[in-house]
């Protein structure tokens, strides 16, 4: 496929932009997609298997722990739900790529799958932002934030997250469609119903800003501000942390890890998209070789973003003793949990171990 024909059809991308020659840019050399046809489907299926199983376990564990669920757990469960909604579309995109960007599934699935991809992106970053805000309230305003962290407030915030995410992703549902190009049917952005050819670049640019600003930059700025305040608070009281505050600090480390990994996974994608946007609008004048590099790197930057959807459950398992304990407890691995506790503190009596098992599986 030639570079000047490369469009948002080439990946299940978070997708409001286009690498086409309709921008008035000179035609460039061809880009060889043979490696992508073979490599990307395998990668998609690995993410699908890990994401489906890992996020499924998270959702089940959070659901089973309802009586003692932390406010953070509710956001974590919804983060897993957003990731799960995305990874179930990956077999379709794997098939699409393996067939040389040929979409055999019809217009409805083209629209729905693209919509779920964008819905995941927005819902994930908004859940992480709310997690960060929840930790900010719990640590910086622990005495005065009870009402804001109540169950009803959390449910309202989740409703706003999903509604706002659904609205921001809606252009993908409207604009994505199938079209025939040569021997292939591709799933692509179609602006013919809303714009003339001359104004398509403005739509692409506007939608690109829509994904980058509320979908990455603004949430990342808010999370950075929250953690600056949290860092100041924790530093001031580091020597006098009570047991409850130590638990908050452990949970804080987990959430910071989630945010950092999210930023690392998404940053290359947004950098490439921003460079393309600036080139498209005439703020940059990229050579053909540079355009080809951007085009070639884009599917792999998108894949790095996809990794985030299957990494989170493994981060919980690695960093959060409480989550591991809940998994052991709810899936019936009580002997394994007892062994884990025995290694941690061999002096515990049998009765204490039994109590600790239940405590780890249900409490903060």
Curated annotation (Swiss-Prot):
Subcellular location: Cell membrane
Membrane topology type: Multi-pass membrane protein
Annotated Pfam families: 7tm_1
Major place of residence: membrane
Domain of life: Eukaryota
Residues that carry a glycan: 21, 183
Extracellular side stretches: 1-39, 100-112, 175-201, 272-298
Biological process annotations from GO: angiogenesis; apelin receptor signaling pathway; coronary vasculature development; G protein-coupled receptor signaling pathway; gastrulation; heart development; negative regulation of cAMP-mediated signaling; positive regulation of angiogenesis
Keyword set includes Protein biosynthesis: no
Function of the molecule: G protein-coupled receptor for peptide hormones apelin (apln) and apelin receptor early endogenous ligand (apela), that plays a role in the regulation of normal cardiovascular function and fluid homeostasis. When acting as apelin receptor, activates both G(i) protein pathway that inhibits adenylate cyclase activity, and the beta-arrestin pathway that promotes internalization of the receptor. Also functions as mechanoreceptor that is activated by pathological stimuli in a G-protein-independent fashion to induce beta-arrestin signaling, hence eliciting cardiac hypertrophy.
Name of protein: Apelin receptor
Gene: aplnr
């Amino acid at each position: 496929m030639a570079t000047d024909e490369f469009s948002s059809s080439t990946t299940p991308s978070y997708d409001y932009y286009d690498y086409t020659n309709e921008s008035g840019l000179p035609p460039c050399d061809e880009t060889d997609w043979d490696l992508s046809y073979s490599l990307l489907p395998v990668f998609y299926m690995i993410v699908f298997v890990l994401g489906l199983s890992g996020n499924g376990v998270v959702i089940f564990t959070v659901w089973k722990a309802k009586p003692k669920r932390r406010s953070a757990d509710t956001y974590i469960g919804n983060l897993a739900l957003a990731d799960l909604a995305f990874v179930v579309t990956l077999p379709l995109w794997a098939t699409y790529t393996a067939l040389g960007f040929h979409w055999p599934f019809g217009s409805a699935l083209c629209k729905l799958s693209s919509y779920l991809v964008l819905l995941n992106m927005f819902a994930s970053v908004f859940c992480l932002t709310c997690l960060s805000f929840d930790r900010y309230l719990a640590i910086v305003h622990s005495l005065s934030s009870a009402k804001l962290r109540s169950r009803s407030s959390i449910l309202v915030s989740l409703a706003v997250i999903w509604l706002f995410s659904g609205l921001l992703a809606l252009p993908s549902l409207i604009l994505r469609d199938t079209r025939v190009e040569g021997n292939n049917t591709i799933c692509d952005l179609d602006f013919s119903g809303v714009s003339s050819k001359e104004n398509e670049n403005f739509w692409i640019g506007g939608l690109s800003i829509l994904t980058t600003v509320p979908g990455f930059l603004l949430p990342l700025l808010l999370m950075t501000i929250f953690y600056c305040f949290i860092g100041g608070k924790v530093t001031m009281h580091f020597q006098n942390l009570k047991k409850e505050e130590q638990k908050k600090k452990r949970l804080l480390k987990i959430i910071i890890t989630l945010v950092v990994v999210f930023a690392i996974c998404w940053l290359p994608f947004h950098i490439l998209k921003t460079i393309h946007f600036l080139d498209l609008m005439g703020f940059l004048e990229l050579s053909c070789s540079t355009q080809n590099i951007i085009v070639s790197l884009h599917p792999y930057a998108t894949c790095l973003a996809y990794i985030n959807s299957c990494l989170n459950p493994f981060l919980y398992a690695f960093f959060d003793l409480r989550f591991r304990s809940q998994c052991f407890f709810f899936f019936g691995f009580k002997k394994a949990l007892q062994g884990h506790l025995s290694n941690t503190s061999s002096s515990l009596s049998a009765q204490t171990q039994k109590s600790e098992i239940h405590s780890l599986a249900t409490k903060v």
